[in-house]
Amino acid sequence: MSEDVLLEEDIWEYKSIRKRKPQSNPDSTSVSMQTVTKGKCRPKRKGSGNRKKSVEKNSTPQKSEQRLRPSEDLDPCKDDSSVYAQESVSSLTEQGSPSTRPVCDGYCPSCQMPFSLLVVQTPRWHVAECLDTPGSVEKECPDGLLCTSTIPSHYKRYSHFLLAASRAGEYLVNSTANTVERKMTCSTAAKSSCFPSPVEDSQAEKPSKNLKNVPNNECTSKIKDSEQRKSLNITSESTSSFADVQKPQQVFQLTQTTDNSCKFEFYDFTSSQESVSEDLCSQKDTSQPSLLQSKADFSDWEISYSPLSTCEESEGEAEEEKEVKTSQNKLLKVQNFEGPESNTEVFKFKKQHCEEINTSSCLYHSEKSASQSHVDSKCSNSPCVDNQQEMLSAESSFPLNCNQEFQQPGLLSPAINTGNKESQDKGACVLDSVYSCLTRTQSLLLTEGGRSPLSQKNKVLRAPSVVLTNTDKMTADATEKGTCQESLQPAVKKEENLDSTGVCFPSPISKTVSSHSLASMNAKSSPAKELKQMDIGVFFGLKPKVKEESKGEACLSEGKQIPSSVAPSGKRPRQQKRKAEGSVEDLEAVEESSNKDGGDANVTSGGQRKWRKRFRESSTTDEGARKKQCPFYKKIPGTGFTVDAFQYGEIEGCTAYFLTHFHSDHYCGLTKNFVFPLYCNKITGNLVKSKLRVKEQYINVLPMDTECIVNGIKVLLLDANHCPGATMILFYLPSGTAILHTGDFRADPSMERYPALIGQKIHTLYLDTTYCSPEYTFPSQQEVIQFAVNTAFEMVTLNPRTLVVCGTYSIGKEKVFLAIAEVLGSKASMSRDKYKTLQCLESAAVNSLITMNWDGTLLHILPMMQINFKGLQDHLNKFSENFDQVLAFKPTGWTYSDSCLSVMDIKPQTRGNITIYGIPYSEHSSYLEMKRFVQWLKPQKIIPTVNVGDWRARSLMEKHFRDWMIEGSGHK
């Protein structure tokens, strides 16, 4: 499975969560949380708008509170299928009787209404409606914390912020108790839904849930390596100031032995807590990948904010914050141990013995872990651990400014672990984000807003023991209240000599712990303060956005990089619209994005730059911006020639620029400042001089159907049957190879009589593939023209006061109105600009049929955009003395439908005295015409030039080409 797919799965939580087999362990006093789902279901995007809100309100650990996941299908008969594990270790049974109405426990995370009041709705249904219509009620319930109303409408009339905060506070306070029958909840703040999610229960992890809310603490962690035992030392300093930013170093030293065992032991400092032991991993007989929280995003990188945010509730949060601080202080009373350096708290990691890990399972978990840990600037530890012989140690020191608004919740969580026994695991979830860090990226960058990039030193990889040492300097700033947008990220560098297949690194920090910390952090802010919404780009398959890097800073490292951007002021970055990778418009603009530097561009993990909003990038860009690269299908190999490549500025190595015809999508970028040799035919040359004011000295006119020598290479221009002046270009290379570039063309059987193509072996055909799909079947040009002529003649014969109108482009579709004018015996009236354009054709026949006099003709030529009922009515009103009816033709290839296989299927639109015929007149080849031309020409190689932005479209076209050639050779 590719990295991109895993990242997207992380975002949308595409995980199958099954009921875990209950364990009856007499020695264990803690209970696992278990969630039963009925199959795997994709989450609704709707819930992503209020993730933070749901965390603030639903983090209450009610005894039998039912938890909902966005990936679960809850129907009225299955509401009981998702339950908490009871505090006894007896087996869980499903209670889903279809004959009785299920009574759901728990509370709505939005309005705090008990689910037991629901009559028809399911909890998920109710929560979804609450989130869709959040309500603007600012009046707090008069009962406050004592509200036990059983009237559903009561929860709509009043807000229950205090009740929500109280339930969240109970969650925090209870986490310090010694009871072993404690249920732990994982934060869903970074997930794509506002619903609660299944949780992991570990007594050793409870205290860490509150880390985010620790006030006035500057927590310095130092992880140190010793010879006898690899230990992890965390230094905790308490200061009264949290405004200053310190710059310490961090060294992770991860030890891996040569065998496949991956074990570590987790020791804690607090001796007053009970020892607990629990299996946190899924059993082999279940298909649940892991209970690890995926995508636990502790910043707002992958979300954009709804404008529905206020600051009015900040004063009302004082009491809530005091309660939260009280519970925090209880949790963070950690005994200090003196180590080699002062104020160090020691905790150790030992490796555990792993079963032979299934490759796909390991990669699945580790990739999902990495996608989170990269964003959260830490390597998360899988809670599935056993104690054995080998030790994993990490050495780091990094001070963090830990006020209420900004913390690294996961980095310090192991330091306050309250258990004295290690958590154990028999499953295959040891592989984790450290492994992913090593295998997925070569470097992980950290940029702190406004400050210098990471100073990376002492990066050592010792092959025998596989010890990865990394020293980073990290800084952290206090951010705006209630935001949590800054995050630190360690830089982990993968060396080339690392045998990644043999590495199985458990990392020292648990995602579950981090999620708890985030839940605690979010519980103190008002639920309606900020409504978060999933980035719309993610919905369309894009990778998650990251914050913009600090102004003017770029931490470039060798190879692929995953940036960790930190906003210097803690403000939310402005949401930007993103274009899908590989889109036709920006295909060439993305090709070289991974190796260019730009001041106003940001490199994402996919290698695509995010540009400021602009409609079209200029051909000659400013310094720091990226210049488009000419795609290969516009270059003629073995020559210095390019075809229709004017939007890329000066192309290196190009000695001649060819223009096939005068349509804007082909001459785009060609201006009066063009100073390179331009080659085209006479009609196109006249249009370039007249319309674009290109200097005549740079325009080289080539005659049609005549071999010419351009820079030592023979070139021949052929009629492309597209628009006036449109040509196909045949190149004869010195090696004897013949290359045909069709430009835009409408294949016609008459081309099979071109002398230059008869018997000519074509090596490469650059083919106009605008309609290269079987559904693009429409009548020939001659049939459509004949239909328009007959219809116009009949209408004018029946009513001589009929005005015939034909739509046209700046250049193109002329054949239709010229044929009508000839049959009606009337000139075609047109605007001065159109008249001058047709004068460039230098055709006596055309000049005899056109005029700028609107009054003396039966046929008027209007721009295509004016061929609608309103535009035609306005035009008719100007000539109401002579005409009382309008017959309009709108010749365009885009109005065809599957039913329009012949002109008999063409139906008019009529409103009053105005009739409009949309006729399927195309200047591009239909699928069958293209197929016939290719089978006749028999090129050795075909290169499509249109609709090449999508690999699926390219693959489909290549399949058509193969089928054509096989079918053509079979006829021989």
UniProtKB/Swiss-Prot annotation:
Biased composition (Basic residues): 39-54
GO molecular function: 5'-3' DNA exonuclease activity; beta-lactamase activity; damaged DNA binding; zinc ion binding
Pfam families: DRMBL (PF07522)
Skewed-composition ranges (Basic and acidic residues): 64-80
Binding site for Zn(2+): C108, C111, H126, C130
Composition skew (Polar residues), residue ranges: 23-37, 210-219
Gene3D superfamilies assigned: 3.40.50.12650, Ribonuclease Z/Hydroxyacylglutathione hydrolase-like
Keyword Nucleus included in the entry's annotation: yes
EC number: 3.5.2.6
Subunit record text: Binds PIAS1.
Family, per entry: Belongs to the DNA repair metallo-beta-lactamase (DRMBL) family.
Function: May be required for DNA interstrand cross-link repair.
Protein name per its UniProtKB record: DNA cross-link repair 1A protein
Species this protein is from: Gallus gallus
Higher taxonomy: Eukaryota, Metazoa, Chordata, Craniata, Vertebrata
The encoding gene: DCLRE1A
